[in-house]
Curated annotation (Swiss-Prot):
Catalytic center residues: E343, H374, K494
Protein name (database record): Glucose-6-phosphate isomerase
EC number, as in UniProt: 5.3.1.9
Pfam families, A to Z: PGI
A GO cellular component entry from the record: cytosol
Protein species of origin: Dechloromonas aromatica (strain RCB)
Class of the enzyme per the UniProt entry, highest EC level: isomerase
Pathway the protein contributes to: Carbohydrate biosynthesis; gluconeogenesis; Carbohydrate degradation; glycolysis; D-glyceraldehyde 3-phosphate and glycerone phosphate from D-glucose: step 2/4
GO molecular function terms attached to this record: carbohydrate derivative binding; glucose-6-phosphate isomerase activity; monosaccharide binding
Taxonomy of the source species: Bacteria, Pseudomonadati, Pseudomonadota, Betaproteobacteria, Rhodocyclales
Family, per entry: Belongs to the GPI family.
PANTHER family per record: GLUCOSE-6-PHOSPHATE ISOMERASE
PROSITE patterns: P_GLUCOSE_ISOMERASE_1, P_GLUCOSE_ISOMERASE_2, P_GLUCOSE_ISOMERASE_3
Amino acid sequence: MNPIDSPAWRALAAHAEAIRPLHLRDLFATDPQRFELFSLHHDGLLLDYSKQRVSVETMALLRAYAETADVTGWRRRMLDGESINHTEGRAVRHMSLRAGDQAPAEVRAALARQQAFCESIHNGVWRGFSGERITDVVNIGIGGSDLGPRMAALALSARQQPDIAVHFIANVDSADIAPLLASLNPRTTLFIVASKTFTTLETLTNARTARDWLLATAGQESAIARHFVAISTNLELTKQFGIADDNVFEFWDWVGGRFSIWSAIGLSLALAIGWKNFEQLQAGARAMDRHFIDTPADENLPLTLALLSLWNTNFLGASTEAMLPYSQSLHLFPAYLQQLEMESNGKQIDRDGKPLNIATSPVIWGESGTNGQHSFYQLFHQGGHLIPADFVALREADFPLPGHHASLLANCLAQSAALAFGQTAEEVRAAGIPEALIPYKVFPGNQPSNTLLLPSLDPYTLGQLLALFEHKVFCLGVLWNLNAFDQWGVELGKQLAGQLTPLIEGNGDLSAFDSSTRGLITALKG
């Protein structure tokens, strides 16, 4: 059913008309206990959503809609292994990758292989063609085969393993790979080629360049076996590349790319932080899985985040959502969320193949604090756009230095308060500001936000954080009645690029293309 046909949806739309004129200043003034009422605690995490433009009635109506949309039923279908990714006929089982002792036998066996491989690198058992230890690992992948491990390796850089440096290559632009190769020693470098099908254009182009670079020094094709491993399901193509079957780590079609950090795609991360830390990452995610499955709606963190996003997007009219981590270690978390949220839910066709005719995923963007304050926060405060935000902060610093962390936290809390409450003309006037400047000093406020406090940034809490947002994305897909686990929107551009590449490299008939594309190709060829 289209969401807008639901009585629960219509009740929310009517309620929004009553809520929209209210200011967060008024909501806090009428309820001094608002923080206690609109905050959730779980396993060291604190979610403060009191600065959202909601009331008790709002949350009750949102939860009623979640019941109508059958979030609980769809969650059960996912856990039971039903093919809820119906357009591809696939189950969605990424949670089983981090299920620990309860994981399927095939998952436990795959993880044991990954652990043994990681330990062979860290212990110096695995060596390059020259007999030297591996000192550098390069992950070659793109999208879900890059964003998750890259983000997490930076987030957990305080736990970087000694004597191993892990690098990431994604873009087909030679400016990505060429400078890195120039800095590395082919005798001590290992490449991980991450591509489920082993046909991804960007990944295979970079992998071939890396292979040529290695062979220019090694001379013998046999060296590939000591310097390349693959994460793929296509043994035929990995073998053609020169990678032995024993050096291929499998994963399954029920693992979507943007949910794959828990699989062999996380191999580069495990090499960066060590296997015990990787297990703690999985443990944190597993704990969040249990919370999501077992906790009632009114205390459920992922569902609450999803409902607030739905409210802001579909009933208050927001078209974007900002992720603002006040942690430089989480600098890449907004980029990771861009794929997780927008590739999952950026769709206009429902599960029945019919147009939705409502907004779905907001545009996700952001920057680490305090950097963003000196670039785009001006727009937040006085730009006239409704921009809901998620602030993420750590109670304890990754790298404690006197004076740094208190200032960072103060800025985080100050920005969330300033966005919520603003500054009135009367307050500006009372501060003695010249009358002519008063309009420029007014801050409208009423910008909704969440603040998520983590005790620290360690593998366990990062696992919690990633699983929290994975489950938020799942809930939103159900609430919008769409399939969050396919991504047909990425296909057309790839098909056209395949047609255009030979035309740019050589000559060919351009008549099938539009005048803009023809003109640009002609200009590129000089």
